[in-house]
From Swiss-Prot:
The gene is pgsA. GO terms for biological process: phosphatidylglycerol biosynthetic process. Its EC number is 2.7.8.5. The chain crosses the membrane at residues 13-37, 61-81, 87-107, 146-168. Residues 38-60, 108-145 are periplasmic. It comes from Yersinia enterocolitica serotype O:8 / biotype 1B (strain NCTC 13174 / 8081). It is found in: Cell inner membrane. GO terms for molecular function: CDP-diacylglycerol-glycerol-3-phosphate 3-phosphatidyltransferase activity. This is CDP-diacylglycerol--glycerol-3-phosphate 3-phosphatidyltransferase.
Amino acid sequence: MQLNIPTWLTLFRVVLIPFFVLAFYLPFVWAPMVCAIIFVFAAATDWFDGFLARRWKQTTRFGAFLDPVADKVMVAIALVLVAEHYHVWWITLPAATMIAREIIISSLREWMAEIGKRSSVAVSWIGKVKTTAQMGSLVGLLWRPDHNIELASFVLLYIAAVLTFWSMFQYLNAAWKDLLEP
């Protein structure tokens, strides 16, 4: 298998994950900013790899598999770090909800693909808006430069949590008839 540039970008995103985790734990005043910058860079490759794969017609099965895995692992780890840092229920609850939703919907998509109905649970615009709010909130909550950005990040986290429920409901609703069949 020959790897193309979009797939290399996805692999690079996976490689960046331990670096933003390490930056998160560094005992320096600048560490949160470095952590957030690495996360922003990784999140940008999420958009850019898909854009290039479509533009250059270089979509591959491996890339189609790895891209969502890299995204979900990156976001789940960032949510765990944020929940650990704040150590309060009102951050942990939306973080846990978002992680649970990713597991549920990934399982649902896998099951729907097995029965030949993967398109019923294709990514929706709500999922894309949720991801944007989620990424924005995580950048601010990893960085924490001042109270205003932190507050805006909390708001974005809750917007992402609401969209998490909404999109999960939509996906489950789309698959409900198939889920209830014997």
